[in-house]
């Protein structure tokens, strides 16, 4: 048996003992103002968007990112084992907040701080975090097979009218870290990759809303 075959066998054995490598259904924490309009999307996500309404807004208030970890989540387990600190959570929340601010600004919208007509509010909660297994994620064969060890994050988010609180869009999603480009060589690289993807999607939705004005 050559070295490549031996490595593949070793990787397969390791992967057999790992849970949660595939898409998971994200639990609902109660953070969103309304879950009733959510519909299933790709990768077990739940989504809702009123495209016509979204296009009417000219600016956004971005609330501080919350953390809502339910019992049994990977984040709770990591906290109990000393693998996830309050500083980690704060740093990741700030990272996501900055990514959202940039997405909004790059799309040509104003960042606002007071409720007023024509302004929407963005609310986001991180609902789970999975630390990157740096040793496993660094093995190319493991990444090719399943994306194992790349870490990730889960969130609930909504856009609501800043005056009425009416929900304009919402999403509930768990996302693994990216394999291309590879993000597995830092403890929270996978979680940040997921957040970057969420911010990128927000930018895309805002661009689409602008084009429909």
Task: Tell what function each PLM region has.
Residues 59, 152-167, 201-213:
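Short secondary-structure transition/capping segments
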Residues 21-94, 204-213:
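A structural "domain/chain start" motif
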Residues 9-17:
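Bacterial N-terminal signal peptides
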Residues 66-72, 129-131, 173-178:
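Short connector loops/turns at beta-strand edges and beta->alpha or beta->beta junctions
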Residues 1-9:
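Bacterial N-terminal signal peptides that target proteins for export
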Residues 93, 97-101, 105, 126, ...:
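Extracytoplasmic/secreted envelope proteins and their assembly/folding machinery
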Residues 102, 106-166, 177-184:
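Surface-exposed short loop/turn segments
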Residues 81-85, 147-148, 163-205:
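Short secondary-structure boundary motifs at beta->alpha junctions and helix caps
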């Amino acid at each position: 048996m050559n070295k490549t075959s031996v490595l593949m066998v070793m990787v397969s054995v390791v992967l057999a003992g790992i849970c949660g490598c595939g898409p998971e259904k994200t639990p609902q924490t109660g953070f969103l103002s309304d879950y009733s309009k959510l519909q299933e999307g790709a990768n077990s996500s739940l989504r809702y968007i009123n495209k016509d309404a979204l296009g009417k807004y000219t600016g956004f208030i971005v609330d501080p990112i919350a953390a809502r970890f339910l019992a049994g989540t990977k984040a709770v387990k990591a906290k109990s084992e000393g693998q996830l600190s309050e500083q980690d959570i704060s740093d990741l929340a700030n990272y996501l907040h900055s990514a959202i601010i940039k997405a909004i600004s790059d799309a040509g919208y104003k960042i606002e701080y007071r409720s007023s007509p024509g302004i929407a509010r963005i609310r986001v909660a991180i609902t789970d975090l999975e630390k990157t297994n740096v040793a496993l994620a660094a093995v190319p064969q493991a990444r090719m097979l399943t994306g194992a060890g790349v870490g990730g994050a889960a969130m609930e988010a909504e856009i609501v009218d800043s005056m009425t609180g009416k929900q304009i869009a919402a999403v509930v999603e768990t996302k693994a870290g990216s394999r291309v480009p590879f993000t597995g060589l830092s403890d929270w690289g996978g979680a940040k990759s997921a957040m970057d993807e969420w911010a990128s999607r927000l930018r895309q939705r805002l661009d689409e809303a602008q084009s429909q004005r």
